[in-house]
């Protein structure tokens, strides 16, 4: 199983790409931590594959100094908690570790630095602009080639400007820079959102593209202070996570609907470990029952007239809480939202809706020729350090369900995710489906070009999309049923499409699937043995 399934990609990286460093993983392999595994790190990686670069651990995955040093590890990341000079000196003095082992590690590190020019070249080439046009082009090409067209009923796509005159874009994902969390989360110099890209290409073709918020945020009901005529929230920004001391800055925010992944834009506030307090006066124009929605990543609290009605002051992935109350027209209500950002994703979203007030959204969807619904995952729901659910995040499932229920206008779904999601509940209602993955800073431009036919979608699925999570070949061994913290890969070589071939289960979309805007004829085909 190792040689046939798991090793080939790593072996190719070592022998064909000539990588300079390799990282060991967190898990046990046949009962031994991979960071301490002499057969894996020495016999296979060094002796069989010929790797002579730096072998480092993943962050915090080194458990003991001596077995890691003897097993072949060169560098413990991040801080050398286990394999450090003091610990190594102790085992050398005891005679458990030979100095030649240390020399070998130093050699691996130095020869790699020399090979890559780190010892004799400047590491900053100032002739390359930070916002490099060549990099922008590469990012755009990758986004164009990576998106996969999965469904296209009656050739709705590409959108034809002689028939399609008005397009509605819905979903918060259309406005955000989208990326997975953890190490995959980077801050681009600039980015083009899905909405910006669709609107720009549409304008070139004389098509009106507008964004429709699935929620009526009722922004006209909120004012920065008592007696003020200025709409918005008075924001106080603190460079700590507990709102202590004086704010480093104050400003008026028109609404609270932020993805601060690229920073708040407030000088003195970084991308982590800060807090914000927003205050405003709410003056509802109509009597009725209202629902307050507050969510984010990390902690958040809501006060109405100094009463704490939502309290989730905890780190964690994006989630939402609601509070319902009756409001009276002409009465004023003091609103206060508190938020803190630790590390990772930085999302805060606050809005309120009048119960049953969906008329505007429904009318807007039915006043266009096509609806582009952008939904899926982002850095708040899909990251390292934990597996996401197969189901969509609740707010994303709510969005696509709401769109489907409110309109008969053709719907094209654009999904951002690093893998498959549950789609049995909504896929049949969509006329088109484009899997965007996480397309990077130029994803919006690429999406607009593909939707309007300037670019032919050519991406193919690199994995099989199952219909149900229970259909996946790994399902039966995924859960730690006996709570011993060990998982046996019982599927063996029957992972991915091999597993579906073996089980005979019907899949949603097979490995290698992907539609385009043209047709192909194959002739005079021959097959030769491998």
Mark where each language-model region is.
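Glycoside hydrolase catalytic-domain context in secreted enzymes
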Residues: 1-289, 298, 305-306, 315-530
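A short beta-loop-beta micro-motif enriched in histidine and acidic residues
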Residues: 295
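Residues that scaffold the ATP/ADP-binding catalytic core of kinase and kinase-like folds
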Residues: 312
